[in-house]
UniProtKB/Swiss-Prot annotation:
The lineage of its organism: Bacteria, Pseudomonadati, Pseudomonadota, Gammaproteobacteria, Pasteurellales. InterPro entries: ATP_synth_F1_ATPase_gsu, ATP_synth_F1_gsu, ATP_synth_F1_gsu_CS. This is ATP synthase gamma chain. The keyword Cell membrane applies. It is a peripheral membrane protein. F-type ATPases have 2 components, CF(1) - the catalytic core - and CF(0) - the membrane proton channel. CF(1) has five subunits: alpha(3), beta(3), gamma(1), delta(1), epsilon(1). CF(0) has three main subunits: a, b and c. It comes from the Bacteria. GO terms for molecular function: ATP binding; proton-transporting ATP synthase activity, rotational mechanism. The gene is atpG.
Amino acid sequence: MASGKEIKTKIASVQSTQKITKAMEMVATSKMRKTQDRMAASRPYSETIRNVISHVSKASIGYKHPFLMEREVKTVGMLVVSTDRGMCGGLNINLFKAVLNEIKKWKEQGVTVEVGVIGAKGIAFFRSLGFKIRAQHSGIGDNPSVEELLGIANDMFDAYKEDKIDALYLAHNQFINTMSQKPSVAQLVPLPELDTDNLDERQQVWDYLYEPEPKVLLDNLLTRYLESQVYQSVVDNLASEQAARMVAMKAATDNAGNLINDLQLVYNKARQASITNELNEIVAGAAAI
């Protein structure tokens, strides 16, 4: 059995770790709430642009943007949004599994897959598997802006415009609630047609006067919308990351507490055994006299 001093040292070490995990839990909770606010603030913007795009594209303007045109799929692009840091449970692994399943399905159909990756964890993962990474970006921090994501987003959009890829999918962790996040893999371009069945009659009137020309307006709207979708997925993934980290750190803090209790019990037993030995030695010494 370890000595009382050794056990005390272990208890102090675990208590120190417990303080760190508790602090990380509190920080993650604060960051998650701030990210949720940003996520809620950006969603109406994306939804409004999406509706306007649907209206403009259905007008008789004699123009079809490449982002709205289906074509034969020979090469697929996959833009994966991961985290820069770890200690967030199985968040990244679950996303990577979902992405690899999608890639497997495409390859079984004879389709080539190229990836673009946001986040250091994703870059390291796909590089280790030998994937060709068309574009990458890391170090986005806790408060990303649309501007800093434009580089990787435009790289993937340009690949589609230049027929280097025939479809682009966006993969990220979708924030459901504090205890639940799920991987999401959705088609980004060609843009899926908006379901207008639930719109009222006023919203389905397409006869508008456009300024500037509908073509210019549609080009700009599509670009802004796709950029907002990439931003939205990054913010969504950040909220998922902080929620997963909060849960992981809470579990670590609770486990540290249980370990401290177990070590304290061992320490008490060791101390009891030490006191018993001392008493036995005293009694034996008295008997010898």
